[in-house]
Structures are given as structure tokens and as C-alpha cells.
């Protein structure tokens, strides 16, 4: 409990009154009239369902020997947006590669880009080893 004197809190010993709702008698569905109404509603629902079924079923004419899939579908040539973006990115990449790989310097840069980290380290180690051997050489 807080120390604030302006707030009053109900004590647990005080009783509170709860308003109860008046209960009503449930509806009796066993009467003859209600059964007839239910049957009548069911018949209407069945009629509606059969009408809906008959209107939504399209008439299909089949030819014997026809293929299930038609190879001349015009939508088959269309490409999804994701695929189109991928193709455009590949095209841009190839164009930039061709642009940079034309000259002699471009070819050397392409070779350097193609090398892995491991091959670069191996080349550096070979260069250092060659320098050490050159330094240790004895001239007569």
C-alpha cells in the first residue's frame, strides 16, 4: 500500500456486490413449426447450391489426340521480373568485362583479379625466397 493519503483503496474485508443477469429460458427447437422452418431453409440452401454449381461449370469440348500443353503459348516467352533483372545484371557484367579486358593492361588486371588469395601468398613467398638466395650468393 502506498503512503499517499489522498487515494483510497478498498479493503479486502469489504464485500462488493455483483449484479447478476437474469436468465431466460432457452429456445425450444423441438416444436413442429421450428422443424418445418429448418427443413424449408435447408431446401432453399440446396436449391441455391445446385443453381450455383450449374452456372459455374464451363462447357469443355475435347478433341481426341490433342496435347494437354500447347507449345505455342505466347505467355511462355514472357520472363518473370526476377529473371529479367538477373539477365540484365549478367549483360551489364559482360559489357564491363569486355570494356576493361580490351587492352594489354586490362588483360593483366583480369589475370590478377582471377587469382585467389592463396596463389597471391604463394607468389609473394616465392619472391622473398628468390631475394634471399640472391643475397646469399657468393661472388668470386
Curated annotation (Swiss-Prot):
A Pfam family reported for this protein in Swiss-Prot or TrEMBL: SVIP
InterPro entries, per the entry: SVIP (IPR031632)
Polar residues compositional bias, start-end: 1-19
Region of interest: Disordered: 1-140
Comp. bias regions, Basic residues: 41-51
Subcellular location: Cytoplasm, Cytosol
Lineage top rank: taxon: Eukaryota
Keyword Lyase set for record: no
Keywords carried by this UniProt record: Cytoplasm, Lipoprotein, Myristate, Palmitate
Bias-annotated ranges (Basic and acidic residues): 27-40, 73-140
Keyword flag Kinase: no
Lipidation (N-myristoyl glycine): 2
Note: Present with 2430 molecules/cell in log phase SD medium.
Name listed for the protein in its UniProt record: Uncharacterized protein YGL108C
High-level lineage: Eukaryota, Fungi, Dikarya, Ascomycota, Saccharomycotina
